[in-house]
Amino acid sequence: MLCNLIHNIHKEGYIIIMISFLLSCIGFAISCSLGIIFLVASLLCIYFFRDPIRIVPEGDHLIISPADGIILNIEQVNSPIDNSTQVLCISIFLNVLNVHVNRIPVSGTIKATEYIPGRFISASLNKSSELNERQRIVIESNVNHHTIIVDQIAGLIARRIVCNAYEGQNVNSGERFGIIRFGSRVNIYLPLNIHISAFKGQTVIGGETILAYLEDYPHKQLTAKFI
């Protein structure tokens, strides 16, 4: 049971959880109430860094949500890597209770990664997409070689973005590629000429919810995998 619990915690949380449990032990040695406070903090850290297995729909034509959260906006904007190109931006806000592990939205190849320094205003504000610290990955999809861009955006509390993707990497939809700590935002930029199934206000699950289709799909039988 303990092994399963550890397996379902993201490695970025190991040190924080160990420190919080150590503090709870010290706290109990001082007073019961102090120990309980640190123990509760430890349990909250375990909850925050949880990394559950997801049932990922299979298909190179699928665009899967890269994060848990709620869709704040779906709007046409200039591409963040090419101002002359219009794309569709889906913005997903993650509160502190959401799973913060990020997943690859589409099968393909990582063409570029980029760290962009910035501020730490609330990730629920639209201007955070341009002003806040963020980490970007650019994916070329296996289907029709579309360019898909994902921005991990830091928030007011989230000041640690982890991205394990690297240029030239072949990736499959649903695979884990990073995490953002304590409340944040993920923007995904898609080409205009695809079928969008997501909608504003929708609650999405990273690695499970289908946001869009790169080609006509309706009569295709979907299968799934556990990741």
Swiss-Prot record:
Membrane topology per record: Peripheral membrane protein
Cofactor: pyruvate
Pfam families xrefs: PS_Dcarbxylase
Pathway info: Phospholipid metabolism; phosphatidylethanolamine biosynthesis; phosphatidylethanolamine from CDP-diacylglycerol: step 2/2
Catalytic residues (positions): S184
Function of the molecule: Catalyzes the formation of phosphatidylethanolamine (PtdEtn) from phosphatidylserine (PtdSer).
Name this polypeptide is given: Phosphatidylserine decarboxylase proenzyme
Annotated gene: psd
